[in-house]
Amino acid sequence: MDFPGSEPTVGLEWEVALIDPETLDLVPRAGELLDLMDEVYPGHRVTREFMANTVEMVTTVHGNIPAAVEDLREQLLQLLDCADRIGVLLFSAGTHPFTNWGDQEMSDKKSYQEIIERTQYWGRQMIIWGIHVHVGVGSKEKVWPIINAVMTHYPHVLAMSASSPAWEGLDTGYASNRTLLYQQLPTAGIPYQFASWDEWEEFNRDQDRSGVINHTGSMHFDVRPSKYGTIEVRFADSTMAIWEVAAISAYLHCLVVYFERMYDAGEELPSLQQWHVAENKWRAARYGLKALIITDRETTERMVTDELRRWVEELSPLAEELGCKAELQDVLRLIETGGDYARQRAAARAAGAALEPGVRTRGDAGAEEGFTQPRAWRAAVELTARTLRETARD
């Protein structure tokens, strides 16, 4: 794998879904929407995705977060315009809270069909949406020390973005059920702690010889190097507001640059034992912003919100230099909201759900237990779609 290296530029990818305005369920109309986008906004950068209910906004390379977010905003406004014209709504979260995954249609792209053929049941359940953040790194020798350092902040980023508490009408008890779903795929999940670029290349040769890459196109680790000379962070849930995307992206931009400068200064970069990384991932997926996380190799524990506040302060001078101080400060605003997963639960609760983790909620009065599209979770979908639209210009 070539890694050309680059300046600390940024690029963002944001997956969103299409829903019916009446049923609020997912609809497989991405092809129709993109055909209209081609007609109305020729040259747009919105792309097809794994499922026929999904589109992805992809920015060009930018020097700072505000420029990248404005690029996303332009695409979001174009999508909202075309979605209105064909009569669908946009929805942005880690998962849809009540849809039946078995009813969803896949895109007809050959590589996607091959993935489904290989992964079967679990692959068909990938009704999930995320945010991917690319940050440029100067050389391949720096990549894995920086990735291993970024993994110490896995729970920080996941807790901020967590927005998938429900699945098929079930309150899972998790802040990010998307995280638990995605790791079922054989090439997804926490990357191995490679000590060098040579180890990474040896690993890829093994995957190529064994046919793994032939089936999947690439490894889908939660964080990975990309052919563009960037580190790609892939594990954040999609959020309901663009300012949240900006806050999470600013945090990651600052973090990668912070660790690259440590490397350049000859300082030892932080890392955690693989088992601590896995535990932190689970804790953030389960508890979101209420997670108690492991912060060092001595197994010190702190609340993730306390750690986020500490790191916002630590990164603020760098954020000012990188032009994203306001976006980084919005991490504190995000903490105050309680997280998208909590807002979805609150909306469902206000609509009358009996939200006991692991117990299916009721729909209309008299509906039997186990009804998979409860009226209560419709309120969470309405909140998410409304917030996405209302904050698109913020």
Swiss-Prot record:
Statement: the UniProt record of this protein carries the keyword Nucleotide-binding: yes
Name of a matching Pfam family: GCS2
InterPro entries: GCL_type2/YbdK_subfam (IPR050141), GCS2 (IPR006336), Gln_synth/guanido_kin_cat_dom (IPR014746), YbdK (IPR011793)
Gene Ontology terms for molecular function: ATP binding; glutamate-cysteine ligase activity
GO biological process, one term: modified amino acid biosynthetic process
Domain of life: Bacteria
EC number: 6.3.2.2
The entry's keywords: ATP-binding, Ligase, Nucleotide-binding
Catalytic activity: L-cysteine + L-glutamate + ATP = gamma-L-glutamyl-L-cysteine + ADP + phosphate + H(+)
Physiological role: ATP-dependent carboxylate-amine ligase which exhibits weak glutamate--cysteine ligase activity.
Family of the protein in this entry: Belongs to the glutamate--cysteine ligase type 2 family. YbdK subfamily.
HAMAP family with a match to the protein in the record: Glu_cys_ligase_2
PANTHER family: GLUTAMATE--CYSTEINE LIGASE 2-RELATED
Protein name as annotated: Putative glutamate--cysteine ligase 2
